[in-house]
A protein has these predicted regions:
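Short, low-complexity, intrinsically disordered N-terminal peptides in bacterial proteins
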Residues: 1-5
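ABC family nucleotide-binding domain
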Residues: 6-214, 218
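Conserved beta-strand-loop-alpha-helix hinge in the C-terminal portion
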Residues: 222-244
């Protein structure tokens, strides 16, 4: 694990949706750090704020108050153009719904963010990712010709292709069966252990969380516990205590 500046951190994060009597406090004073070179999972019951936390940490949503840093950059100091550039250059995203472009091949989807940015992909690195996720025979296929697990492996390779400082994964196995889930999660864990990548994953699945090195538990917009060296059984027991 790398030392020094965290890959991302939040201080006293508050997120309020709505106003007056209809206001909902989705994040209620959260402070959290995600170390570089670590695989972290965020868990909690439905409505606990876990996806809101990830979206605010990744610059996809704005916080009501508090500070979010990606590396040493505070997001609130950036204008829209600078924030877009930071998300493109320093953050990788993996979503539950894959978010692949249906008219592009797997290979074209993997390098799409760099193509849009006008940057030449590092071919040796992209080739290594393709072989690690086992997609070499499928590179010329479009998403409709791939299984859900294969599509998510394309999305995972795309997230890492530009060597981002941090990857945020929002329920990356939510649409997958257990075998496909294990393949995607195994790749994310390998990316941390062998490639020194940083991954922060939101999940509701204790088995998925067990692939992480650290699990942060949320309830009612607050961090209520965390666990290192998690197992599916220990995570499930803790979640039962949170009422999910």
């Amino acid at each position: 694990m790398s030392n020094g500046t965290p890959a991302a951190r939040g201080t006293n994060l508050v997120k309020v949706y709505g106003e007056g009597d209809a206001a909902v406090r989705a994040l209620d004073g959260i402070s959290v750090e995600f170390a570089a070179g670590q695989f972290s999972a965020i868990m909690g019951p439905s409505g606990s704020g876990k996806s809101t936390l990830m979206h605010c940490m990744a610059g996809l949503d704005t916080i009501t108050s508090g500070q979010v840093y990606v590396g040493d950059v505070e997001l609130s100091t950036l204008n829209d153009k600078e924030l877009t550039r930071l998300r493109r250059d320093r953050i990788g995203f993996i979503f539950q719904a894959y978010n692949l472009v249906p008219t592009l091949t797997a290979a074209e989807n993997i390098t799409l963010p760099m193509d849009i940015a006008g940057r030449e992909p590092d071919k040796a690195w992209v080739d290594r990712l393709i072989d690690t996720v086992g997609l070499r025979p499928r590179l010329s296929h479009r998403p409709s010709e791939l299984s859900g697990g294969q599509q998510q492996r394309v999305a995972a390779a795309r997230a890492l292709a530009s060597r981002p400082g941090i990857v945020f994964a929002d329920e990356p196995t939510g649409n997958l069966d257990s075998r496909a889930s294990a393949e995607v999660l195994g790749f994310l864990r390998t990316s941390v252990r062998e490639f020194d990548q940083t991954v922060v994953m939101v999940t509701h699945d204790p088995s998925a969380a067990s692939y992480a090195e650290r699990v942060v538990f949320l309830a009612d917009g607050r961090i209520v516990d965390e666990m290192t060296e998690p197992t599916a059984e220990k995570v499930l027991d803790r979640m039962k205590g949170l009422g999910d």
